[in-house]
Amino acid sequence: MPALLSALDGAVPIVLAPTGMVPTRAMTPHVPLTPDEIATDVAAAAAIGITSVHLHARDADGVPTWEREVYARIVGAVREAAPDVLINVSTSGRTWSELEKRADALALDGDLKPDLASLTLSSLNFIGGASVNEPETIRGLARIMLDRGIVPELEIFDLGMVNFAHVLKKEGLLPGPVVANLFFGNVAGMQATLPEVGLAVERLPDGATWSGAGLGDFQLTAQSLAVAAGGGVRVGLEDGIWFDRARTRLATNPMLVERVHRLLDVHDRVAMKPDELRARLHE
């Protein structure tokens, strides 16, 4: 089968990012913050159809936290509510840069051990601040994931990060199948345009399983371009709290997942089952 037709055939992943570090109750009443709220949203999304969930932890006051104990409560609640869905924990450097803090959730074990963990491949600026990711911190997180048997889910905001994925592959820190989220629409990163999506996808390591994500008002545009290019979709209130560009209607996580399924239907695609991605990760 020609490469393009092959890329447009079969199931694609849907990654739910329900919470993030930025949305607050003051911004939207729909963002899930507690373990039970997150689990409820994941279960509702799983009933519609998702492949994996990308988790951020909040403390009792709704403030982002790196603490393993909080992640344990969230992961436990999600495992119970949606046992098939693959779980990804964040190692973000947006609020803290210390390797020990960022890696704390990677020590979860048993049924709480995450399937995947995020790995941002360079430092970057958001409109309100920086996410600092020094090369040795990235390598340190990758080594811990490799030792723990946790698959890195690469977070890529620009073409330099794509190149660094190849560097880590050559160094043996990404020995297995590559899983990546490509982010478009950030003020200091790739934009949601055809040329930038195409170039980023073209330069990914061979055989990568990738999803497209759009920040803020670019969520639907980036998702549409990703599906048209043969990729999956990342969706959720972490990336944008509004359902429409006019910002007249606040979204919920299930609403956003339902819209992705309508998008897939138009392109004659289906959501990848969790077990299909699970098998792909261990090929």
Kindly give the residue locations of the regions a language model identified.
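Catalytic alpha/beta core domains of metabolic enzymes, predominantly
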Residues: 116-238, 251
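Short beta-strand segments at enzyme active-site cores
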Residues: 50-60, 87-91, 155
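N-terminal small/glycine-rich loop or linker at the start of catalytic domains
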Residues: 4-30, 118-125
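Alpha-helix-loop-beta-strand connector modules within alpha/beta enzyme cores
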Residues: 16, 63-91, 140-147, 199-207, ...
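Glycine-rich, proline-tolerant flexible connector loops at the mouths of alpha/beta enzymes
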Residues: 26, 51-74, 126, 183-184, ...
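Mid-to-C-terminal alpha-helical segments outside catalytic/metal-binding sites
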Residues: 259-283
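Active-site beta->alpha loop and helix N-cap motifs at the rims of alpha/beta catalytic domains
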Residues: 35, 40, 65-132
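Conserved, mostly hydrophobic/aromatic
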Residues: 38, 45, 56, 117, ...
